[in-house]
Amino acid sequence: MKVDPNKEKALAAVLIQIEKQFGKGSIMKLGEDRSMDVETISTGSLSLDVALGAGGLPMGRIVEIYGPESSGKTTLTLEVIAAAQREGKTCAFIDAEHALDPIYAKKLGVDIDNLLCSQPDTGEQALEICDALTRSGAVDVIVVDSVAALTPKAEIEGEIGDSHMGLAARMMSQAMRKLAGNLKQSNTLLIFINQIRMKIGVMFGNPETTTGGNALKFYASVRLDIRRTGAIKDGDEVVGNETRVKVVKNKVAAPFKQAEFQILYGQGINRTGELVDLGVAHKLIEKAGAWYSYKGDKIGQGRANAGKYLTENPAIATEIDKTLRELLLSNPSALAAKADASTEDNVDLETGEVF
């Protein structure tokens, strides 16, 4: 298609003017942006990293993780922090709920000595701290726990029973407008944990909604819905949860995928169990009866023993993880081949059998 040379000259002139005024890279042709391959941080779950499409949560973006109580929201964010710290990144945790357990965080691999933590008095203070950390360019990951606990100053200073309609929504809307651009500039990942509420009078459709208004829904590049779907038992004792995460929104890859994994109490995401399941599904690990083998060598009888072997041999676990990431991230639809047990059933920790 023939382009008017006068238009080309005018466009070149205005692009030079914009870059001179606002800095290099402030405007460019989309095809020339070589940074479209987004930097990511692992969630701690291989299947969730694959479901996200990019291999983890994207840097420089806003992410919302929501779900019912005790579904694993904080655990998932602590796994992200631990993964980021292993890469030498600086992380901050804004504990608006005043409920962060440092002992549990340490068990998940979080370096609590180097984790920045704030327990703000008001929602405005929490969001101002987020903005200051973001603009510094020195913090890579910020977690806010939770949006529901970000109480506006006017509500705290008022009386119980006073009406404060829309205050939290306005506060979040203003904060999102301010934070979004700064996060992109500083390449900081900001994760909001959110709670679920029920809409009154909804007869058709989903009555569930999240707190804090609609601004976060629009500004978030990724939204994850996390649910507990079953119990993991060791004998009669419940030792963990079967967990399902749905990618409700995704601006960096295809949305609406889901991942299933186990969260063990006091240990976090069961990575080795996930490696065993995915390894068998994609024929990296052989299964004959109850025995599991890798490259001809038996690694354990029963899923739990195979997982224990991988825990004791991290080099082999890393090798399997790397191979699976190369396979699944180049072909995300391959994840659908994983044969999961029904999420409505309980799973025996020792044998992996449904009961």
From Swiss-Prot:
PROSITE patterns the record matches: RECA_1, RECA_2, RECA_3
One MF annotation (Gene Ontology) recorded for this entry: ATP binding
Main location: cytoplasm
Top-level taxon of origin: Bacteria
Name of this chain's protein: Protein RecA
Family: Belongs to the RecA family.
Keywords (A to Z) from UniProt: ATP-binding, Cytoplasm, DNA damage, DNA recombination, DNA repair, DNA-binding, Nucleotide-binding, SOS response
Record's keyword annotation contains DNA repair: yes
Organism for this UniProt entry: Shewanella baltica (strain OS155 / ATCC BAA-1091)
Subcellular location(s) of the protein: Cytoplasm
InterPro entries for this protein: AAA+_ATPase (IPR003593), DNA_recomb/repair_RecA (IPR013765), DNA_recomb/repair_RecA_CS (IPR020584), P-loop_NTPase (IPR027417), RecA-like_C (IPR049261), RecA-like_N (IPR049428), RecA_ATP-bd (IPR020588), RecA_C_sf (IPR023400)
NCBIfam families: tigrfam_recA
Pfam families reported for this sequence: RecA, RecA_C
Sites where the protein binds ATP: 67-74
GO cellular component: cytosol
UniProt function note: Can catalyze the hydrolysis of ATP in the presence of single-stranded DNA, the ATP-dependent uptake of single-stranded DNA by duplex DNA, and the ATP-dependent hybridization of homologous single-stranded DNAs. It interacts with LexA causing its activation and leading to its autocatalytic cleavage.
GO process annotations (BP): DNA recombination; DNA repair; SOS response
